[in-house]
Amino acid sequence: MYGNGPVFKAEGTSFRDQPYAEQLPQGLWTTGLCDCHEDAHICVQTAIMPCVSFAQNVEIVNRGTIPCMNAGLIHLALGFIGCSWLYAFPNRSRLREHFALPEEPCRDFLVHLFCTPCAICQESRELKNRGADPSIGWLSNVEKWSREKVTPPIVVPGMIR
């Protein structure tokens, strides 16, 4: 939708110097909450197994500190009792902090409480639009960024474990 270039800042350059910097809205989501149709693969995967899509997002947003398998199993277990949103909404908050995105259309916990599949899809699309591929995992993305001379987003202070 907004070009193919990653949004992660290359070494030694400012964000505005990037050739793709103007292609994405700064401080805005690149897709809407209900734009699931924009990526059929993510939409179908999330409809069938939301824990997989969620887990892939978690691994990227948390920079590999939470393994995909662990996040997926926790999400699945909580889903059986209808509480997966409790585990999911903090990840949305972290994603928003990484990219300075607004809390819309409402609070993160409400988005996940009432629209978990749509929220997971939107978060996956956001990561893809900003240069990360959740389906390949954190380490593979780091390798890809290294080859392309691109660095991952800077973690906001206070988010480091």
UniProtKB/Swiss-Prot annotation:
Coiled-coil regions listed: none
InterPro entries named in the record: PLAC_motif_containing
KW Membrane (keyword) present: yes
Residue spans crossing the bilayer: 71-89
Location of the protein in the cell: Membrane
Membrane topology type: Single-pass membrane protein
Highest taxon above the source species: Eukaryota
Signal peptide residue numbers: none
Sorted UniProt keywords: Membrane, Transmembrane, Transmembrane helix
GO cellular component: membrane
Keyword Transmembrane among record annotations: yes
Function: May be involved in heavy metals transport.
UniProt record similarity statement: Belongs to the cornifelin family.
The protein, known as: Protein PLANT CADMIUM RESISTANCE 12
Organism whose genome encodes this protein: Arabidopsis thaliana (Mouse-ear cress)
